[in-house]
Design a protein with these regions (language model features):
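Charged catalytic carboxylate motif
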Residues: 196, 268, 328
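C-lobe/activation-segment region of protein kinase-like
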Residues: 259-264, 278-284, 292-357
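Phosphate/pyrophosphate-binding loops and the adjoining catalytic core of nucleotide-dependent enzymes
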Residues: 1-186, 191-192, 200-201, 217
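Conserved hydrophobic alpha-helix
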Residues: 269-276
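Eukaryote-biased feature marking scaffold/signaling PDZ-domain proteins and nuclear chromatin regulators
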Residues: 178, 214, 231-233, 281, ...
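Conserved structural core of kinase catalytic domains
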Residues: 185-264
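Conserved protein kinase catalytic core
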Residues: 227, 245-246, 291, 309-311
Length: 357
């Protein structure tokens, strides 16, 4: 069954309800002022569910969704008319850089029981999926000579293994020539990590370490949108690593269960990290999702953005250091993967929810 919408972010209080949701490539920013609908039948039902959610500690996701599903269900036909296409496969990356955006507000009529929504007549075009474009004029001088691919020439490819193809634009894409590669978007809130990762990928490439020999990603250039002075950087490309049907990284249950290969993967990761350190390059983000297993069942080290995972590397003094890399590898294989100790991985939860109506 197709998803009616995905909620990516939301703020709920007794005085204000604001949500951001997407349907296909279209995004909606919806404001629901409780005071404006409190005298309507729908508004009263909404407020009962809202107060039930706010009374819970800790907050519950199902309770969080109940008032939103009630209100969004009431306006689902409007959302469907404004965003008739749900499927994103085959769309260009540029479609998400300039995504149709509606800023809507729910309100109750002064005299009557009807709840309406306003703002449907005006469409804005803004970056979607948390893409945070960077002007080429503001990019480091060292990026000037980097190969650049237009976002309009890259198309989304979604695999069956993906739990939620709408969580991020990151993933497999195809060029107009039919070549498969991997797109990493520049996302809001991760600007520093993006800059660091590009610099590390450049250093890996310049040192001749990229590729299968050392199991490190090959930097294939930046992704841009627009032309001339208005051109912006929206991401970069690296080679796409083909994984087995079992999964793609150490956190995948099918991969993690391959106990006989754990030592091999540990040795490979240690060798790769050692090679990086010999060239004064720090991995900076040791965690299960950043060890990719390819179709030959070999372990690759990816993601040098430096967004440190405190479960594996101590934030206070070891983040983005060689010592931190070694600590991370030890905790990853010596504790987490082996099951020794009580180390647990706390996954980052993206604030979105699939709504099937």
């Amino acid at each position: 069954m197709s998803s009616a919408y995905y909620i990516r972010d939301g703020y709920l209080s007794q005085d204000s309800v604001r949500i951001k949701l997407i349907r296909g490539v279209t995004q909606f920013q919806i404001s629901i002022p409780p005071i404006s609908i409190q005298n309507t039948t729908l508004g009263k039902q909404f407020l009962v569910l809202l107060n039930e959610y706010l009374s819970l500690e800790p907050h519950d996701m199902d309770a969080y969704m109940r008032p939103l599903d009630l209100m969004l269900g009431h306006f689902l036909q409007v959302l469907m008319e404004l965003a008739p296409r749900v499927e994103v496969k085959g769309l260009s990356i540029e479609s998400f850089v300039y995504a149709p955006t509606y800023k809507l507000e729910v309100f109750g009529r002064a005299n009557g029981d009807e709840v309406r929504i306003k703002g449907i007549e005006k469409c804005f075009w803004e970056p979607g999926y948390d893409v945070a474009p960077l002007s080429v004029l503001e990019a480091p001088d060292s990026w000037t000579a980097i190969l650049k691919t237009q976002a309009r020439d890259l198309y989304l490819v979604r695999g069956e293994q993906e739990l939620n193809p709408l969580k991020s634009l990151q993933g497999k894409v195809q060029t107009t020539e039919g070549r498969t590669t991997f797109f990493r978007p520049k996302e809001r809130g991760r600007e520093k990590e993006f800059l660091r990762e590009v610099e590390m990928l450049l250093r890996i490439k310049e040192a001749g370490l990229a590729g299968s020999a050392h199991r490190l990603p090959s930097f294939e250039g930046l992704v841009v949108a627009g032309e001339n002075q208005d051109q912006v950087i929206v991401g970069f490309l690296v080679n796409f690593i083909v994984s087995p049907s079992l999964g793609s990284h150490l956190l995948s249950p099918g991969i993690k269960s391959q106990i006989t290969l754990h030592q091999k993967w540990e040795n490979q990761v240690r060798d790769t990290v050692k090679t990086l350190h010999e060239h004064d390059i720090v991995w900076g983000d040791a965690n299960p999702c950043n060890v990719i297993i390819d179709e030959k069942m070999d372990a690759w080290v990816i993601d040098s953005g430096g967004r440190n995972n405190a479960e594996f590397v101590d934030d206070d003094d070891k983040a983005e250091t060689k010592e931190g890399d070694l600590q991370g590898v030890q905790r990853l294989f010596g504790e987490w993967l082996s099951g020794v100790g009580d180390l647990e991985v706390e996954l980052e939860i993206h604030s979105f929810h699939r709504g099937n109506l």
